[in-house]
């Protein structure tokens, strides 16, 4: 919300009033400041359009509560099962507390980072916005010696903005 241009916000199909509100209240020093500005809006729909997925292994409990419908108890449970090795583990553990529909809804807001050289193609496909073709490309260029190699190889298929987004989801041992 701090970096998006007016035209980028409009492309998200949000109301002109909300676009103006966001622009006039920037910069947001934290997600909590942004959340306060959105108090009178349908945050669930908006967050699906603009939310940056949270890393299940590093996000603090307070930030998990920014996910629509996540309260104290569920935020605690998100932290309780760390470290997560896969989205499947998250589904299994959190599925003890909520139904499958709710677990699936949470997947719009979170991710488990993947190790580039060892993660299964299934775990790579669980990353936000990564489909079969991109997951295949991640695997095809193994072994990765460093993140520069990842940037060079995957950068053949996506623009710089998407490459930066994808890099948030991966690491090397």
Q: Which residues fall in each region the model found?
A:
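Alpha-helical interaction/regulatory segments in DNA maintenance proteins
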Residues: 36-57, 88, 92-117, 154-173
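Short alpha-helical segments in extracytoplasmic peptidoglycan/chitin-binding modules
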Residues: 9, 19-23, 33-35, 64-67, ...
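Long, low-complexity acidic/proline-rich regions
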Residues: 125-128, 132-152, 157-173
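Short loop/beta submotifs within extracellular cysteine-rich repeat domains
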Residues: 18, 29-32, 41-42, 74, ...
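Small-residue hinge/turn detector
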Residues: 15-16, 71, 131
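Short functional linear motifs
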Residues: 6, 19, 43, 61, ...
